Amino acid sequence: MNLALNLLYKRGFLKQCTSLKVLSDLMDREKIVFYAGVDTTSSSLHIGHLIPFLAMMHLRQHGHMPIVLIGDSTTKIGDPSGKSEMRKILSSEVINNNALSIKNQLQKITRFSSSCFIHNSNWLDNLNYIEFLRDIGIHFSVNRMLSFETYKRRLDFGLSFIEFNYQLLQSYDYYMLNKIKNCKLQIGGDDQWGNIVSGVDLIRRKMGVEAFGLTFPLITRSDGKKMGKSEKGAVYLDSSLYSIYDFYQYFRNTSDSDVKTFLYLFTFLEEDEIESISNFKGNSLNKAKEILAFEITKIVHGEVEALKVQEASFAAFRGSGDRSNIPFFKFSFSGLEEEILLIDLMLDSKIVPSKSEGRRLINSGGVYINGKRVENQNHCITREDFNNNEIELRVGKKKFLRIVL
């Protein structure tokens, strides 16, 4: 197998591929243009979106030429893949702002030049609908489209005609990139398989050449939960939506059984180093988790920020060092009040989702103020609890928050 493809396979990226042997031989002979698309439904990607772009970085290291297709036009329709209901229709202004934000985010992570980023509005916004149906729609079988899991699943919930067009438009994207950029490979999550193979088929029919598609597994944790979700919601790559400290801690808290898998997927460490790290046992496995958390934080947020939150994590768990990057909640006593119920403070700071959960944690001995366990659910915080205008609130073993006056 081609070296680049073999690397993706060994690191756990490869799920399905059209004509793998033919693609491998082609990549042995020449450096190919390949692409992954991203819709602009949000101002930020989350960690679950990152896999295709990490794979792109591996392929780029082997000399292949990436294109990131910004789906500013297809976002106006919405991809039904993996959805049980129609996406909310966004305004053009929101879509354009999201497109710029995501492009900047991916440029920072991948270090790809601006020329690697293309918007599909370049060709989709001015399509003539009648000509599109005559030239492109004629190559699509409704029966075949309905055989794909994306559409089969949605038929039970309702599928709008506008969403039904999505596969044609994504296939047209691939066709256009093949036509103007000689792009020969589309990569994406496995939920995109139907859209990708339809594009491969359209290129064969329209251009008379073979193109290829490759998908990655949808990453889940060993507990069955979807990768990229946390108690605080989606693990966004934008630090204003999900703090860098919490991002680091998300990976620092990886379950033992996921460490090796995530080291292969979310870092660029060499195979022998990963195998060595993965053999850590007992408490030493925490070191492997620290390495994982540092490496992926470095990729997404840069080495300087990764070092800061790593030091903050060490300070929180070991009780010494620079604590300034531990998340904080700005608090002030209201009016003449000189105390506040701890339960209320926990809820205000969002370290717990409800007062009942706060009471449960206190009663089970899982809440600490400045390292001292809280015994009473009616415990009050006073000014005397603050040292240098802050206190440390810990919930459970892993949640730390500085309360700052």
UniProtKB/Swiss-Prot annotation:
The keyword Transport does not apply. InterPro entries: aa-tRNA-synth_Ic, Rossmann-like_a/b/a_fold, S4_RNA-bd, S4_RNA-bd_sf, SYY-like_C, Tyr-tRNA-ligase, Tyr-tRNA-ligase_bac-type, Tyr-tRNA-ligase_bac_1. L-tyrosine binds at Y35, Y166, Q170. The keyword Zinc does not apply. It is found in: Cytoplasm. Coiled coil: none annotated. A motif ('KMSKS' region) lies at residues 226-230. It comes from the Bacteria. ATP binds at K229. It catalyses: tRNA(Tyr) + L-tyrosine + ATP = L-tyrosyl-tRNA(Tyr) + AMP + diphosphate + H(+). Residues 340-404 form the S4 RNA-binding domain. Keywords: Aminoacyl-tRNA synthetase, ATP-binding, Cytoplasm, Ligase, Nucleotide-binding, Protein biosynthesis, RNA-binding. Its EC number is 6.1.1.1. A motif ('HIGH' region) lies at residues 40-49. It is an enzyme of class 6 (ligase). Its main location: cytoplasm. One of its GO terms (biological process) is tyrosyl-tRNA aminoacylation. GO terms for molecular function: ATP binding; RNA binding; tyrosine-tRNA ligase activity. One of its GO terms (cellular component) is cytosol. It holds the Pfam family tRNA-synt_1b. Belongs to the class-I aminoacyl-tRNA synthetase family. TyrS type 1 subfamily. Homodimer. Catalyzes the attachment of tyrosine to tRNA(Tyr) in a two-step reaction: tyrosine is first activated by ATP to form Tyr-AMP and then transferred to the acceptor end of tRNA(Tyr). NCBIfam families: tyrS. This is Tyrosine--tRNA ligase. It comes from Borrelia garinii subsp. bavariensis (strain ATCC BAA-2496 / DSM 23469 / PBi). The lineage of its organism: Bacteria, Pseudomonadati, Spirochaetota, Spirochaetia, Spirochaetales.
